[in-house]
């Protein structure tokens, strides 16, 4: 099976074009639940692939509005690459999306979800038990944690989720980057540079050097509601045990439109199975 058999073709892709703004990207991420959007530019009448902008980029750079500065380069692949080789590249580079290119032209995107869908359909190997693939380290937060704090925890942990625990340390839900982006909004304002010069009134300062007025610079921030995480999390949890196969779990992920499921041993949280973990079993 090759990348061409699993990828999303260019005709079905949502892209943003340079020049453009962060609001264009945020709109698509919120509307479609994507993790990133390809960036293209028209050069001499031809569409040229430039890079990707992800939801992490928007949150990490709240004051940047230019797509050319927000976007980043990521590994690419070709349509005739094997799905196994592409999956290995996704895992090694921790890239959720591989742009599929033909020269400078974008011909499609291969996502983690595309590969998971192939596993679910039995088109590639999916017989390994997920207990051997799961990540045992779990990022967690509390139901009463303010959303901005929970979002920061997710960012610091370097994972796209936090399992939400109640007062008894039992699973109450899960908060994902998708949940955060859905309620994020861009707020514009101004910040003053101040109207005085440091030490302007000291005895040794040069005479005549005084501040003549404040300057105001435009600012742009991503703002999140300050309510507790329980108001924004997903509370209908799908869990799996370690004896389930990668194919079984892939089918659960596709059916429920999620990127990860908690791994349980009885009723105890034992790990997390992320969609990208399943690619390691191919």
Identify the residue ranges that each predicted region occupies.
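Tandem CBS (Cystathionine beta-synthase) repeat/Bateman regulatory domains
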Residues: 1-282
